[in-house]
A protein has these predicted regions:
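Short catalytic/metal-binding and nucleic-acid-binding patches
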Residues: 1-332
């Protein structure tokens, strides 16, 4: 029996999660439907824009994403420190961008004078909404409901648009350590290349990889580091003391890893791997052949959690699992 979402997502175990939603009805989310020859390419923009917009409202940062023909991937980071530091007013203002709220909250946001009882209600509502702003299930619920309504309106039909996996129509995988995080980021960003929808990361439309590369190209020649898009969780370099919030890799190293991996996958050169390995693989001590296997079959190799055996055991103990799920040897 599948574990409920609250037993799959626990920020104390890891703040990083990979989420996937797939369409039902045989309908295409985006791209050209080969059965009807109808193009839904414009829907890629819907999904991408909504993912990035929600990342600015929720206390959840977008690390990576890829919008495919009948599904999409997104890697999310639960920003607990931002969630805790928001004032009640900021919480109410953010949530009001998504929903209309109630009369008392709207009066408070407008700056109207409230009595003590009304202020108590506002405080209770703010605490509830603060929790939701750091809740991945709510992030995915808002995203999927918006896209489903738009698609159903365009298709002139009703009914479910997303596969009913658990709740909110999405699957999630906890990314328990840096090895799992690096593998999942590359798995998501290289989706179009594996599906032969693109030749390289910079031509992969509606992916975080293209966002990173486009921003890096705008870097001035005298800059000390590459430009990064402010709508994605930034790369902050290798782990060290007093690290700011961000992805624990160098952006240059990650882009090198994407190009190296993408080239091998595109030309199927698994038997002739270049000896000059990307720095990330060296630092994380991942065997190249295992890495390629992982980037191709990440969802198959791991179910609700991904990481080394020690990381998986730690999370299972933390969540009170009766047994440790099978772990791919790729990250052990």
């Amino acid at each position: 029996m599948p574990k409920p979402r609250k037993c799959q997502i626990a920020v104390d175990a890891t703040p990083y999660y990979h989420c996937v939603s797939r369409c039902v009805r045989r309908a295409f989310l985006c791209g050209l439907d080969p059965y009807t020859q109808v193009s839904y390419e414009h829907r890629r923009g819907w999904v991408e824009q909504k993912i990035l917009a929600l990342g600015q409202v929720f206390c959840i940062d977008v690390c990576a994403y890829a919008v495919m023909s009948n599904h999409y991937h997104v890697v999310l980071f639960i920003n607990s420190s931002e969630q805790a530091q928001l004032t009640d007013f900021e919480v109410l203002e953010r949530w009001s961008q998504l929903f209309r709220g109630n009369l008392i909250v709207n009066r408070y946001v407008r700056g109207d004078d409230l009595c003590e009882a009304e202020l108590y209600v506002v405080n209770q509502v703010a605490e509830l909404w603060r929790e939701r702003l750091g809740n991945i299930s709510w992030f995915m619920k808002v995203l999927n409901e918006h896209i489903a309504r738009e698609a159903n309106r365009e298709d002139v039909c009703t009914g479910k648009f997303w596969e009913p996996d658990a709740d909110q129509g999405f699957k999630s995988q906890a990314l328990l350590d840096d090895k799992a995080l690096a593998a999942c980021l590359a798995y998501v960003d290289l989706n179009p290349i594996r599906a032969k929808m693109a030749e390289s990361p910079e031509t992969s439309e509606h992916t975080s990889a293209k966002k990173w590369i486009d921003a890096a190209k705008r870097t001035k020649s005298n800059a000390l580091s590459l430009n990064q898009p402010n709508i994605l969780l930034p790369f902050i370099g290798n782990p060290r003391e007093s690290m700011p919030i961000g992805l624990p890799f160098k952006l240059t190293d990650y882009l090198d890893l994407l190009y190296w991996t993408g080239c091998i996958l595109r030309h199927d050169k698994r038997g002739a791997i270049d000896e000059s390995l990307p720095p990330i693989l060296k630092r994380l001590k991942i065997e190249p052949k295992n890495w390629l296997q992982n980037v191709k079959y990440f969802e198959t190799n791991f179910k609700v959690m991904a990481g080394s055996l020690s990381s998986v055991k730690f999370k299972c103990t933390h969540l009170g699992y009766q047994r440790v799920p099978a772990t791919s040897p790729i990250l052990t």
